[in-house]
Amino acid sequence: IAEDIYDLTNLPKKGNPFTYDAFLAAGENNNAKLIAAYFNQNGLEAKYIHPKDAGIFVTSEPCNARILPSSYDKIEELRNHNEILVIPGFFGITKEGQVCTFSRGGSDITGSIIAAGVKADLYENFTDVNGIFAAHPGIIKNPHSIPELTYKEMRELAYAGFSVLHDEALVPAYRGKIPLVIKNTNNPNHPGTRIVLEHSNDHVTVVAVSYTHLRAHETD
C-alpha cells in the first residue's frame, strides 16, 4: 500500500487527464487490500483482486467511465474462485492501462457490473438506511420503507431525486435480470427494499412520492 501511494506522487501533475482519477481511486483500492488482509488474519480465506485482473475494462472517460461490453466474459471467470473476493469499486481500467473512475455512486456501479458478469442470483447493496423510503424522511415523519420496487420505478425515483442508489448502478443488474436488495449495514436483519423486474403483487398503486424543484413525481 505504501508503494502504491508513493507511485501516485510520480504521476504527471499536468497534461494527464487520468491523474485525478488515480488519486480518487486510491482510497477504495487500498481499503480493499486492507479488508482482504483482515479477513485472512481472522481465518477467512479471502483474495484481493484488482479491477484489471477482474476484467473491469472501461471507456477512456475520466470521472465518467462506462463498462466495455467485452469485459463481461472475463468477469464471469470470477465464478471459478472459492475464496471471498474483495474487489475495489468505483473504477476500472482503460485498454491503455489507465485508471478511470465511474461517475457518482461508482462503487454501486461496480457491484452491479460484477453481479451481472458472474450471473449472480442476487445483488445485495448495503448502505446506511433501511432500504428505499416512500417519502423523504426530512419532510415526512417516519415514512415506511418500500418492500419491493420494479427497476422502472426505481429509475424514475432516482431520476426524481431519490439518492440511495445511483440510477446508472441499476442498468447492469437489470440487463442481467438479477434482483437487487438495498439493505442497511447497521441493521442487516431488516429486509430492506427488493428491486425486481416485475411486481409479485399486481395491486400496487402509488409506490412513493418525490419532488424536484417543487414539482411532484408519482410512480405507479
Where do the language-model regions lie?
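Conserved small/polar residues in nucleotide/adenosyl-binding loops
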Residues: 212-220
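A conserved active-site cap/scaffold subdomain adjacent to cofactor or substrate pockets
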Residues: 158, 166-194
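Nucleotide/pyrophosphate-binding catalytic subdomain
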Residues: 1-170
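Charge-rich, low-complexity amphipathic helices
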Residues: 60-62, 137-138, 176, 180, ...
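Self-splicing inteins and homing endonuclease
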Residues: 56-63, 187-203
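Active-site proximal loops enriched in glycine and acidic residues that flank catalytic Cys/His/Asp
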Residues: 127, 184, 218
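Flexible hinge/switch segments at interdomain interfaces of large molecular machines
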Residues: 205-211
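A broadly conserved detector of short glycine/acidic/proline-rich loop/turn motifs that flank catalytic sites
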Residues: 52, 90-91, 184-186, 199
